A protein has these predicted regions:
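C-terminal transmembrane helix pair
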Residues: 161-162, 220-221, 332-340, 344-345, ...
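C-terminal ends of transmembrane helices
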Residues: 44-51, 98-112, 116, 307-319, ...
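Hydrophobic, membrane-inserted alpha-helices
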Residues: 17-22, 40-47, 128-133, 177-180, ...
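Transmembrane alpha-helix interface/packing and boundary motifs in multi-pass membrane proteins
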Residues: 47-55, 131-141, 178-190, 374-385, ...
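Membrane-embedded alpha-helical segments and adjacent helix-loop junctions characteristic
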Residues: 2, 57-58, 62-164, 323, ...
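Hydrophobic transmembrane alpha-helices of multi-pass small-molecule transporters
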Residues: 1-89, 214-355, 448-454, 458-477
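Residues that define the loop-to-transmembrane-helix transition and helix capping
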Residues: 57, 76, 123, 171, ...
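Membrane-core helix-loop-helix motifs of multi-pass transport proteins
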Residues: 159-243, 428-465, 477
Length: 477
């Protein structure tokens, strides 16, 4: 995790977080105490995550502390976040990749990728971003981000770019992966649970089965806009370093000169590939093995690394080695973001936020779209996007019906906004932070991208409503 130095700004952040929390708790503001305490927790954690007065993993325990003192929601819902299935996915993937370090397969994979993709920084950013975007169109974004970040870090360490506090390239590569995994979910209904919430509401509204091709076609303009804007932000971000160490030919020769792959390398690589394949093929066997979810698949294969022996019959991974090299802070940070979402949702703060938006009287269609998109982006940055969809979709439907507007186009626009969160280290954005990315760096770059993407979604959504007669027209069974 990022190193902490007690500068003046950090001391200010240390005091500002709890001070804002107390301010919200003590001043009524016409809101229930539970709602004020939940919103205060959001501000507290946000200040500490960006200002880093303490390690981000420590901040991640604040939902437990606040809920213990104020009883905002059921404590079981908060505590369960720290032992959620996706936490085990991160731990299992981490166990496999530290086995890669011991066997040397990380160098083999890195040299192969560098020989194929090349060492141009912009090319690396584009390839990682597009790979994450396309994969997350069909797969859970946490799985995509965890797998690709692990592989990318192996490559970056190989070319002496593994220290994210010193490297100019590594932060951009990890942002490319996590932003791509975030954006890609919009492309198909399979891109995330938040999309299925939208599908469920559409089926309820129409009284008929939803045809998935409608999603792909009608959300394509916004998907393209989000992808293009985000990629441009990444490529235009100033980076003084234009290439990684070495050349494509150098890495191709290095890869070809490596000794024959050893048994332990094959097994550690196979563990990762099999875990990924079983995760991606989950639909084929989930009826027979309902509890074998991706997190537990990776944990099974990760645990197997303790039993893997090298040619001298010594364990490849010992507990002592794992204890020192596992990214414990990442697990707590990821869980803390989920716990914060549970706190905000369980306290009723999310519903209050959504209702405040619904009360705004608007005559301008484009301003209404802008407010819906902006509100959803802010809320999905704090709570997970599935919870955000569950809370706000009924509000969006109510607003559209109340203003006598077509409902489906506004549902499409709202759905796009659940897939464009970039600033806080919650949800999948905790993964690069766990690898060492500074939360402040993510916040600054993410804020710029959020503003540009919000504007692009607003404009494209408005143009679709105004000039595309088929936007919102569904193929009904």
């Amino acid at each position: 995790m990022p190193a902490i130095t007690h500068t003046k700004s950090k001391r200010i952040s240390m005091l500002a977080g709890p001070a804002l929390f107390l301010l919200l708790v003590l001043i009524p503001l016409g809101l229930d105490l539970k709602v004020r305490a939940a919103l205060g927790t959001v501000l507290w954690m946000g200040f500490w995550w960006v200002g880093l007065p303490v390690d981000p993993a420590i901040t991640a325990f604040l939902p437990v502390v606040v809920n213990a003192l104020f009883s905002l929601t059921d404590m079981d819902g908060i505590i369960s976040s720290y032992a959620a299935e996706l936490v085990f996915l991160l731990a299992g993937a981490n166990l496999i990749t530290i086995a890669w370090e011991r066997t040397g397969v990380d160098k083999r994979v890195a040299s192969m990728m560098l020989s194929l993709v090349g060492t141009s920084v912009k090319q690396q950013i584009a390839v990682w971003f597009l790979a994450a975007t396309l994969l997350s169109a069909f797969l859970p974004n946490t799985v995509v981000a965890a797998i690709l970040c692990s592989i990318a870090m192996s490559m970056l360490k190989f070319v002496n770019e593994g220290d994210l506090k010193k490297s100019r390239v590594a932060p951009l590569v990890l942002l490319a992966i996590v932003w791509g995994a975030n954006n890609g979910g919009l492309m198909t209904p399979l891109g995330g649970a938040m999309n299925l919430v939208t599908v469920a509401y559409i089926e309820e509204l129409t009284g008929t089965e939803f045809i998935y091709t409608d999603w792909v076609i009608q959300l394509l303009p916004m998907s393209i806009a989000i992808t293009v804007v985000t990629l441009l932000v990444l490529l235009l971000t100033k980076c003084e370093q234009r290439t990684l160490e070495g050349s494509r030919e150098y890495f191709r020769e290095m890869h070809q000169a490596m000794p024959p792959i050893r048994r332990e390398e094959v097994l550690s690589l196979a563990a990762f590939i099999l875990a990924a394949v079983l995760t991606f093929a989950r639909e084929l066997y989930k009826e027979w093995l309902p509890n074998l979810k991706p997190g537990y698949i990776f944990l099974i294969f990760g645990s197997r690394m303790f039993f893997l022996k090298d040619k001298e019959k010594k364990p490849v991974v010992t507990w002592e080695f794992a204890e020192k090299n596992l990214m414990w802070g990442l697990y707590f940070l990821f869980a803390g973001g989920t716990a914060l979402g549970a706190l905000v949702n369980g306290s009723g703060a999310a519903e209050v936020f959504a209702e405040l938006i619904s009360r705004i009287q608007l005559d301008s269609e484009i301003v209404l779209i802008f407010i819906i998109v902006t509100a959803n982006v802010i809320l999905s940055d704090v709570i997970n996007n599935t919870a955000c969809a569950a809370v706000t979709i009924p509000i969006v439907i109510g607003i559209a019906q109340g203003l006598d507007l077509p409902v489906i186009p506004y549902l499409w626009i709202a759905t796009a906004s659940y897939n464009i969160s970039y600033t806080l280290p919650t949800s999948i954005r905790a993964i690069p932070i766990g690898h060492g990315l500074e939360p402040k760096y993510m916040f600054k770059k993410g804020l710029l991208n959020s503003v540009l993407v919000i504007i692009s979604v607003t404009l494209v959504g408005w143009l679709c409503i105004r000039f595309w007669p088929g936007f919102g027209v569904l193929t009904l069974n």
